[in-house]
């Protein structure tokens, strides 16, 4: 197949703007999936966590055969926390499909990926989706998209982008809102006409950049990437050029292409093809698979540096080992090492203590996804509060800042502006939306946002929408206010007693219900005041042998707050840890015994 018959394109979309639905429809209508049974809903989200949260974490490839052309669609993570993934993906494609909701317009999360795509000189195609929705305003959204591109420094050619109006759910697209349409033909044709075929010479020496790494239990490590030049065959001897310019020889055992979403074995591939190669044991992302006789490296892709760091401890609570399968230092270390083989933007460092590791990533979500995956795999561990990575630039301390966008009902905007102001945020823009809500933009230190999401949802009665995105490093602003409330800490090991919890309810809100296993030093609730209170949730009612006059008081327990991983990580202070097991999320003090905590809090 000559490279003229291939189109490689990345799809960029905000959470819930209909990316996966659109890809499902493109697959169905092109007939690519005829050989497959019913398309499972949302075919592109393959990881259980992605389907559940509706976000894309790992980029995936889909191939669509349209007429005599193969269209490779690569999914991009919409979140800046996965910036490492994004940049490598965009290096494989020649155009981008930006999918925008006809009502919400371009969102901050897509801004990050779009800016990277424009900087690489890729030409965008804008698809305005959900035009059948009530309250949609496609024309205003096209204008907003144009303004976004202009603000991101797009060239005149990039600003002259084609616009396709679509309803992915109903399976139609059109170039003009007045037209009638019942299929996606005009979208296929726009991709064919606007996206250039991949450059590359099939007759030149082989060059292919390792874009993502995957693992298969049967064939081992799989390298995914686009063949930049030359050809690659099964059984061919190749050379890997590592980042330090050292070289290593391997033999290709299998080449896999994509048909729809399925990997299929192919005998060979040439310049322009996006493929998976097996048989290469040691290669890192960004390194080059090259011709054995004439190995020439491609430029290594620079990945954004981490901005947040956290400690992972081996779980040493009194309940350690009762709920998980993997609990030892070695098992945790092996799992973290496996993660950084494929998750390039993540760093893992050993610390002075044998059972504590330091992990650094692009944001709370980036690290949170790894912890949630480990929890589902059966790991037990404890993690510390996230801290930002502070840099010294020209002798001055600098910390990461994020651009924050909030959409709130007008009645809550004062509270939000005040709360974020206390956290070091500066307001940069305020506009009224058509539906009566207000969109406010801020620049805020990343530190100020840790722990803010749940407070924001409480302040806006669950109606507000908050997005934040790494912006740049800026001046360090000193101490920021911490949590307003203290916590209730258990003084005993045992099972919680309903009567004791009932008596403690007037002191604050509980994280635990009756008959739950507790231990000394475990945080069981939020104190209504700003100090920590050590309490006994295990004490039963004193019973006397003299019958009391009157009835027993009825015990009426308030439903406890359910802790999720994100909420717990946001909530804790520096002297606390989140204990994570496959069945439970608990909060505990670093030092479980009260006299140890008192000693640690005394000034030296």
Residue ranges and their predicted role:
Residues 86-100, 105-149:
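Conserved P-loop NTPase nucleotide-binding/switch module
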Residues 1-100, 104-106, 144, 213:
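P-loop NTPase switch module centered on the Walker A-proximal segment
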Residues 123, 133-193:
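Canonical P-loop GTPase G-domain recognition
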Residues 40, 67-71, 91-97, 126, ...:
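Gly-rich Lys/Arg/Thr-decorated short loops/hinges at beta-loop-alpha junctions or inter-strand turns
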Residues 16, 22, 54, 73-75, ...:
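Residue-level signature of catalytic and energy-coupling elements of molecular machines
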Residues 160-162, 189-193, 197, 223-604:
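Accessory interaction regions appended to the cores of large information-processing enzymes
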Residues 196-197, 209-217, 394:
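Short boundary/loop segments of OB/S1/cold-shock single-stranded nucleic-acid-binding domains
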Residues 203, 215-220, 499:
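A contiguous, basic/glycine-rich beta-loop/short-helix subdomain that forms a polymer-engagement track
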């Amino acid at each position: 197949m000559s490279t003229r018959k291939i189109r490689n394109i990345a799809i960029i979309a905000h959470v819930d703007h209909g990316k996966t639905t659109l890809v499902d429809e493109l697959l169905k209508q092109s007939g690519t999936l005829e050989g497959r049974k019913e398309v499972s809903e949302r075919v592109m989200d393959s990881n259980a966590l992605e389907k559940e949260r509706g976000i894309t974490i790992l980029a995936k490839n889909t191939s669509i055969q349209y007429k005599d052309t193969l269209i490779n669609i690569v999914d991009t993570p919409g979140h800046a926390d996965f910036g490492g993934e994004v940049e490598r993906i965009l290096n494989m494609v020649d155009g981008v499909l930006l999918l925008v909701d006809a009502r919400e317009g371009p969102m901050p999360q897509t801004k990050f990926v779009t800016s990277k795509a424009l900087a690489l000189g890729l030409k965008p195609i804008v698809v305005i989706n959900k035009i059948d929705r009530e309250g949609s305003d496609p024309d205003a959204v096209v204008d907003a998209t144009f303004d976004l591109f202009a603000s991101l420094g797009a060239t005149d050619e990039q600003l002259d982008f084609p616009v396709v109006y679509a309803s992915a759910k109903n399976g139609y697209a059109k170039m003009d809102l007045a037209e009638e349409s019942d299929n996606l033909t005009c979208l296929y044709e726009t991709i064919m006409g606007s996206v250039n075929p991949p450059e590359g010479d099939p007759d030149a020496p082989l060059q292919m950049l390792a874009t993502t790494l995957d693992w298969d239990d049967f064939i081992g490590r799989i390298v995914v990437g686009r063949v930049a030049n030359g050809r690659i065959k099964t059984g061919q001897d190749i050379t890997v050029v590592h980042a330090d310019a050292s070289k290593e020889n391997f033999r290709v055992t299998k080449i896999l292409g994509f048909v729809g979403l399925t990997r299929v074995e192919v005998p060979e591939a040439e310049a322009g093809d996006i493929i998976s190669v097996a048989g290469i044991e040691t290669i890192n992302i960004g390194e080059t698979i090259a011709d054995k006789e004439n190995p020439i490296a491609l430029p290594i892709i620079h990945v954004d540096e981490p901005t947040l760091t956290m400690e992972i401890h081996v779980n040493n609570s009194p309940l350690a080992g009762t709920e998980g399968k993997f609990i030892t230092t070695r098992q945790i270390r092996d799992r973290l090492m496996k993660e950084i083989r494929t998750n390039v933007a993540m760093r893992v460092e050993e610390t002075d203590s044998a059972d504590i590791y330091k992990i650094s990533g692009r944001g709370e979500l980036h690290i949170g996804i790894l912890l949630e995956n480990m929890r589902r795999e059966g790991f037990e561990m404890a993690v510390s509060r996230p801290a930002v990575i502070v840099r010294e630039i020209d002798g001055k301390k600098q910390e990461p800042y994020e651009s924050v966008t909030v959409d709130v009902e007008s009645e809550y905007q004062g509270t939000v502006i005040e709360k974020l102001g206390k956290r070091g945020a500066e307001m940069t823009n305020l506009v009224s939306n058509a539906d009566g809500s207000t969109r406010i933009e801020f620049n805020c230190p990343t530190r100020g946002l840790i722990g803010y999401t749940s407070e924001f949802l409480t302040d806006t009665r669950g109606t507000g929408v908050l997005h934040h995105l790494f912006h740049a490093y800026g001046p360090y602003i000193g101490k920021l206010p911490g949590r307003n409330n203290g916590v209730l800490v258990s003084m005993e090991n045992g099972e919680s007693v309903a009567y004791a919890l009932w008596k403690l309810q007037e002191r604050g809100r509980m994280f635990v219900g009756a008959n739950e296993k507790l231990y000394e030093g475990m945080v069981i609730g939020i104190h209504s005041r700003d100090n920590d209170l050590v309490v006994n949730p295990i004490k039963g009612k004193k019973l006397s042998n003299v019958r009391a006059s009157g009835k027993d008081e009825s015990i009426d327990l308030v439903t406890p707050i359910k802790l999720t991983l994100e909420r717990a990580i946001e909530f804790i202070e520096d002297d606390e840890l989140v204990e994570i097991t496959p069945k439970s999320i608990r909060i505990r003090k670093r030092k479980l015994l009260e006299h140890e905590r008192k000693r640690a809090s005394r000034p030296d």
